[in-house]
Amino acid sequence: MEKLEAIVDDIVFQSDDGMFSVLRMESKAQGRFTAVYHGNAPYMGENVAMEGSWIEHARFGRQFDIQSLQVLQPTSVAGIERFLASGAVKGVGPVTAARIVEAFGTDTLEILGTYPERLAQVRGISAKKAAAIGESYSQLSGLRELMVFLEAHGVSSGYAARLQATYGATAITRIKENPYSLAEDITGIGFKTADRIAMAMGMEHDCEARLRAGIAYALTQAAGVGHTCVPEELLVRETARALAVDSAMVQDVFSSLLEQDLLRTEEMGGICLIYPEYLYTAEVQTARRLLKLRDQAKPVTRVNADEVIAKWERDAGITLAEAQRQAIYASLEHGVFVLTGGPGTGKTTVVKGILNVLEQAGCRILLAAPTGRAARRLADSAGHPAATVHRLLEYQPTGDGLCFGKDDSDPLDAEAIIIDEASMLDISLTYHLLKAIPGGCRLIFVGDVDQLPSVGAGSVLKDMIRSGRMPVVRLENVFRQAEVSPIVRNAHKINRGQMPEFLAGADSEFALEEFANEQDAAEFVARTYAQLTSGGDWRRVQVLTPMHKNPCGVQNLNKLLQKYLNPPSANKPEVNIPGNVLRVGDKVMQIRNNYEKDVFNGDIGRVIKIDGKNVTVAFPERPEGDYVTYAQGEVEELQLAYAMSVHKSQGSEYPYVILLMVQSHYIMLQRNLLYTAVTRAKERVLIVGSKNAVRTAVENDKTKRRYSLLAERLQESSEVF
């Protein structure tokens, strides 16, 4: 690698997450040149020592790719003035910088760091302002020291600002004491990064701090794939493997954690299951509260349900199937009720019937769903306002996890609550929902248990049904009007383990296009998407895929689709986001709930304006002109949405779905994933890839059981329904 020393002449670009910078530099050896740096940019006027290599960018030409960077103290009067005038030190602009340097010359930085009170000698600087300038310079010096420390230990200096904000002046001391605390305290730093710092600092690979952090990491990873608990033997073995240490060492630390009540255990079938405290509490309390609610609510007797239902059928011009009628009555009889069924089986009709009776009885009713898109669909289909579960519970963002305004101390004002898309509920959110439900309120879960389970830990809907202790009605009859749909027919065939029937032609209602080469399949998808949306209706088509990586994964597809649909141009503004770039015209997805902006995880919109680092998005569900603007630091809430994972599509419907199914997705080729993807489409499904991949998914009904004891807890003390 080449070593260079240069002055920062200009900061051309800095990403919102502080992890990428484009700099204009000037040095005696190279003259003026462009450099790119994966980290926080130094300030204009600062002198830096760099190591890196020269690269040739296809669009921007020759650049110096900085691998490591150290800020040097400016030594010349001109360099010091330029640094201060850059805005690096709060309260100092070009005029004040010139006055300070005129007064102190090359001693300026020593004055700032050691004798800031002397700044009051400069015209226009009061004693109070001098103290503020000194404090700002001190923080900046601490930040620079922290950046150097991180770089020395192989960690991007882009984390420095977050570390300083969390730990203040003690950041380096805190990290040295226990680098593994970073994984708990700093968003974006996980166990692996903390472990890399610890190893670079010379910590022993079998020290107790590392083993404790490794166990916590293993439990976090397990929760990330849906488990609320893990068998002790598996937990110890996997932790030892990940840390490359002896299992006996992990077992010793694990036993210590149990003695300190930092983990919880449960015996089941001769197996010791280990829980993190928060998931143990959530699971135990969910079971207790479900059983209590089930038995508390009294049957609805304020109206004659038979008469209300009969009148509603006449007015609506429908005749309920017997299972639908039973479902309505069951919801009125029990405090907790579960309604499940596939597409076309009439779940929406049952919900409308339940609402009709409850409204006639004068009940206070609330409707909710796990995502914003699902809530809007519920509101449209039921003709009743609906919210996300988070909004219903008055979610309050905190750095410590889930926090809600509604709980058992201030419960919801409702006599009946209907939760749609209940298969998406994880155990933590269900627990917080149940905490906010008042005694005597009835709770109705509606969802398709055969779809993918929640992204978070637990299988709440499936476990409630599996327990046999909750009243359940499963709708299985597909109604005649739905039966004519190839999508509905094939969805049920897939769910029964049968291959779907593909119709001839890529423009048919249910088609397959086969490709031997995955990149060819991805290119075909991009061309087809471009043709289908050439009229400008970008909302009609959605590309779905099982995985994020490989040629047919979310990341590559989004880049490819963006290239076809929205390529760069000189007059088209753009802004960087992690792993990609956004341009005016791009289809984007909100990836976390933002209640201040009233946008939710999964909302799809279109970029209509980029002004500097501010991005404005139009979301079609909002009134015309009610746009959402994202400032610097908020843009990372967006990602390209031409393609998305099947998991991310849960709770949504699209007129046209293009689904990638290739053999390299084998680890994800499962029946419930294919079933979930197909049921996202209202009008047409085009599967691109291989028939063998489809067959693999159809035949693979061995969905890995999630470690969870919710069903068993519900069975412990209850009468069977």
Name what the model sees in each region.
Residues M1-N304, F721:
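Accessory, non-ATPase domains that flank or precede helicase/AAA+ motor cores in DNA-metabolism machines
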Residues G45-N47, G585, G602:
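Loop/turn positions that initiate beta-strands
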Residues S53-A58, I591-K597, Q663-H665:
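Short, charged beta-turn/beta-strand-edge "cap" motif at the junction between a beta-strand
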Residues E267-G342, T349:
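Pre-Walker A segment
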Residues F337-A379, V446, F510-N517, Q531-N550:
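Conserved RecA-like ASCE P-loop NTPase motor core of nucleic-acid helicases/translocases
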Residues G353, V357, A361-C363, A369-S381, ...:
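Conserved helicase motor core of SF1/SF2 NTP-dependent helicases
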Residues V449-K597, I608:
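Conserved helicase motor core of P-loop NTPases
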Residues R496, D603-F721:
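C-terminal accessory regions
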